[in-house]
Amino acid sequence: MSTVFLILSVLYAWMAWNLYRPAYDHPRLSILSFAFGLPTGELGLHVIFWQAMTVAFFLLIGAVSGFFGALGFLLCAASWGAIAFYYFESTAAQKEVISGLEEGLGEGFQNQINEALRQQFAEEPDRALIRHPFQHRDPNVELIRNVHFGDFGQRLDIRRPRTSEPNAQMPVLLHIHGGAWTYGKKDDGQGIPLMNHMAKRGWICISSAYRLSPSGTFPDHIIDCKQAIVWIKEGIQAYGGNPDFIIVTGGSAGGHLSSLLALSDGHKAFQPGFEEKDTAVQGAVPFYGIYDFTDEENHFPHDGMAKILEDSIFKMALIGNEQVFKEASPRFHISEKAPPFMIIQGTHDSLVPVESSRSFSKMLREKSTHKVAYVELKGAQHAFDVFPSLRSEYVKFGVEKFLAWTYSQYLKSV
């Protein structure tokens, strides 16, 4: 049993090592690195607790003995120290977020925020949420499930303050889930910490479903997102929302779709049968999105993403169909009329290279007449915001500030 314990200890040591040195260069290894890195990093104290419980079990049965037992125990102790250091180091996100917002919006941006909105800002992470990361319901938030929209049986969920008034004219936040355009659901946990937080701040938050590949083929995904915008503009007033102020957000594939939606208002190929409908939004907050399907600048170190796109999403090769892939890429829709953006990316994302987000934000700043904030989080893995953690709490607070700033500019203009 000492050998078994040592093998388990080596696994724990690799999990800690993976936080600092994730795999980037091989498609399957990068996915494995993400699958272990996300929970180990963002739920670090929980992981340490459960690992300690397994070590306690081995101690009870006398398996931690001899050279192998001592070596295994030392590996576990070192791993826990490394995980704890990584976890608490993520508090740097507080400064990273504010720095990114100040660079993009201006150092005095918080003074431009409506006083009533500014008074709602939280400064300290919600420790209860962090202790119970899988608790998705909030007693102060009303959840309305499975509202139908669009032409293909799509559904969306609505979160709003439980005390909201029907004619409240609340600003709207639309969340688009990720999942490599092939899996994921509107209610699988993605974006819920942010949506619950903003609903308690007087926003209507919507999470919408869209057709997935391989049964769906691009542009089905973005068409469904556009139809969600049309429904919001035509139907959200009945729920107390303001159809004239919509911010769109999402992570990974949702980061791609939210960016593309924000940059392609009126693009007829994405609005078949409703070409004349208004699908404009007032801002976008993409997390770790994919912005260039052609990878023109060679940011991806392997062909894993290209294979997903060719085999499942487009069902055609990139070579010979470059224009199709470009049309689906937010990068090639950037113009001077792009709305305000807040782009969020981790440096240790093993699925989406940080360089791609840097390039996208740079191009947006060069071409758009609106503000662009870019927030880069040291050490953050892909999908870091799925769980309430120290890092995701500070990022959530930063997103709230961006949303409040954008909404304040809107209120000044009406």
Question: For each predicted feature, which ranges?
Answer:
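Alpha/beta-hydrolase superfamily serine-hydrolase fold, recognizing
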Residues: 1-414
